[in-house]
Amino acid sequence: GTPPLAEVVFVPKAGYTGLARLNYTGTDKNGAEFSGVVEITITAPTSSGTFADVGANYSWAAASVDYLYRAGVVTGTDATHFAPAQNITRGDFVLMLYRAFGLQNAGTASFADVPQDSYYAQAIAAAKAMGIATGGGGGTFNPTSPLTRQDAMLLIQRTINATGGSLRDGAEASLSTFADRGNVAPYAQGAVSALVQAGIIKGDNAGRLNPTGSLSRAEMATILHRVLTM
């Protein structure tokens, strides 16, 4: 027969609230068919159920932080803290992509500035082998440097495409509503446009992309949550 309903997990799209109706059919252990409807009311949490520092001020990120924590994509800075305002580094972001997408360890060659015994070395080596992480000049990756928003978008697009998905470069016109669209570097233009068109990137309350700005851990969580549930 089919699995009991208690064993079925429903994952709503990031940011969704309201009533979800799920029609189901199945067979019991004797082969008899059954069907029905499950109604689930989805509400937005006001704080994290795991981390004390993801409270009312970060209610917009709470569901995403908890989702990624349960999925094994992120960890806290300790058992009860997430440090949501802390800027995420390039190395840490690649590690989260590695966990989120199950990147394969296709190689051991990494970058000159990534120590082999660092906690993100395996993730960066895999990302390099898959063409996701290309680094900068001189064979370096700058893993401890803050990640810019446009570089995060480029890494996400490459990861999706390298793992069987398809996220083509978007149209430049999709950025027309953002006041700072001219600040997007040419190398990231297609990726930024693609993520905007897909609804993953929405900009800030002032209508800006802030492409060269850093990305906080809370912002990272909301973006990755949207990517994984889109």
Predicted features and spans:
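Acidic, turn/loop-rich segments in luminal/extracellular domains of secretory-pathway
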Residues: 1-42
